Structures are given as structure tokens and as C-alpha cells.
A protein has these predicted regions:
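Accessory nucleic acid-recognition modules appended to NTPase machines
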Residues: 28-199
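Structural signature of nuclease core domains in nucleic-acid processing machines
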Residues: 197, 224-226, 238, 248
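Active-site ExK catalytic segment of metal-dependent nucleases
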Residues: 194, 201-209
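Switch/connector loops and helix/strand junctions flanking conserved nucleotide-binding motifs
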Residues: 136, 211-213, 241-245
Length: 256
């Protein structure tokens, strides 16, 4: 995810406010305090929703684990790192990640895999389902501190991935057809939407302007075998759609 060329337009500042606010239904009411809501949400989650799944003495460690997961949204899952940060063993970290998935706090995005291309990662990526909760856990107290922070790109990617999956499901798609691409040479494509034997590559950029170089990595799909490469997209902060190449279009975040 690129983080260059961030635009200062009012639309894009509103976008960062939306990302920071999160998607919880109660927060659609602007009079509801963001900080108070998420403080109460986390407390209720730990005291009620999780208590039946972990022992009470582990609540503090589980909170640290929750924060560690937020700090890794948009990244490959590494159970050892999560376990270290929470002060638990790897087996516990794996179990707790399952708890977060089952309760809808995080999702794991599976990598694209093809028998024709063995050198692809099998490790999923971790995404929070609500960017507001991730911002709260990480102490990003305002949209501006988020936008200027070190994790802006990862949180932006988390938001876009969530919106793409929601839009795809609303259109009758199957979330199991949404992947990412990463191979042994660490070449990556943020999203792959698979429709039968056709792969649609999607890149996510925080910038408002993208060039052909931003999608040069899409060419790795030509080596996958048994698949065709369909129309691609770069989801970014442009105001209007425009062609990047003959087969790739820049798409505004607001339109997904």
C-alpha cells in the first residue's frame, strides 16, 4: 500500500474521519462519544463476550493480544509475534485469534493459491473488521493523528478491504473468492477477486494519483497458469475514475 501524495481535500479528510469513526451502528449518531463508546465496547467484550472462552486471569493478557492484533492489521499473521507481545505461548495465541475471528472482531484473508505456481505464500493476512476499534486500541485519538501516523497505510488498506468484501457480498459474490497475492520473491497484489478462471487484480493506494508503475506487479499473474487476467483496479483517493492502463482503472474509495 502506498502512502505518498496524500491529498488534503475536504473529501479525503472526511474519508479519514469515516475510517477513524468506524462502522459501529451506534456511532452513526454524531452525538455519541467515540472514545466513550469504544472504551465501553472493549470492556463489555472482555467481561461478557470473551469470559466464557478464556479464564478470568487471562483478561489482561487477552487485552494485550487484542492490541497486538490491531497493531498488525493489514499484515501477514505471525502467531509467534502475537504470542510474544501478549506474554502467552503460541498455542494460546492461535486459540485467541480463533476467538477474535469467531466473534467478528477480525477476519483472515486467505492468499491466492495455484498448483501451477508452488512458490506462493500460504500465510493469511489479518484485518480488523472495524477500523474505529483498531484506532481506539492503538491510541489514534483523531482522524488527523491517524492520517499522519505510521500505520495510516495499513488502516486505510483495512478499511478498503472491508468495503470491497461488503460490496462483493452485497452483489451476490462469495467472500471465499477474495484473496491476496504474495509469492516467495515477496511480490504482492493487495486483492485478487476470482471469478471462475478469471483473476481481477486490485491495488490499494492512499494517494490520489497513480501511474502505470503502481500496477506493474499485476504482470505476475501471467505466470500463474490456467487463469486469465481480467480487468483490474487501483482503489485510491482520486475524485473521479480514470484509466491507468488499457485494462486497469483508478477507482475512488467512495465508489466501492
Amino acid at each position: 500500500v502506498g502512502d505518498d501524495g496524500r491529498c488534503e481535500s475536504s473529501e479525503n479528510l472526511d474519508l479519514w474521519a469515516t475510517i477513524h469513526r468506524g462502522s459501529m451502528p451506534r456511532l452513526m449518531d454524531p452525538s455519541v462519544s467515540w472514545d466513550a463508546f469504544y472504551t465501553g465496547y472493549v470492556r463489555t467484550y472482555l467481561e461478557r463476550d470473551v469470559r466464557d472462552l478464556i479464564t478470568v486471569k487471562d483478561e489482561a493478557s487477552f487485552y494485550h493480544f487484542l492490541v497486538a492484533c490491531a497493531a498488525r492489521t493489514g499484515r501477514l499473521v505471525n502467531h509467534s509475534d502475537l504470542a510474544r507481545d501478549a506474554g502467552v505461548d503460541t498455542k494460546t495465541a492461535q486459540s485467541w485469534l480463533s476467538v477474535l475471528r469467531a466473534s467478528g472482531v477480525v477476519r483472515l484473508l486467505r492468499p491466492f493459491w495455484s498448483n501451477a505456481t508452488k512458490r506462493l505464500t500460504k500465510t493469511p493476512k489479518l484485518y480488523f473488521t472495524d477500523t474505529g476499534l483498531a484506532c481506539h486500541l492503538l491510541g489514534w485519538s483523531s482522524p488527523e493523528t491517524l492520517r499522519r501516523g505510521a500505520m495510516a497505510g495499513h488502516v486505510f488498506e483495512t478499511f478498503v478491504v472491508g468495503e470491497v468484501i461488503k460490496s462483493y457480498l452485497n452483489a451476490g459474490g462469495d467472500a471465499r473468492n477474495v484473496h491476496f497475492y504474495r509469492d516467495a520473491r515477496q511480490r504482492e497484489i493487495d486483492l485478487i477477486i476470482q471469478e471462475g478462471r478469471v483473476l481481477h487484480p486490485v491495488e490499494i493506494k492512499t494517494s490520489a494519483t497513480v501511474t502505470r508503475e503502481a500496477v506493474a506487479g499485476f504482470s505476475v499473474l501471467n505466470d500463474v497458469g490456467d487463469y486469465d487476467v481480467g480487468a483490474g483496479a487501483v482503489i485510491c483517493q482520486t475524485r473521479e475514475p480514470y484509466p491507468v492502463t488499457a485494462t486497469v482503472k483508478a477507482v475512488p474509495v467512495w465508489s466501492i
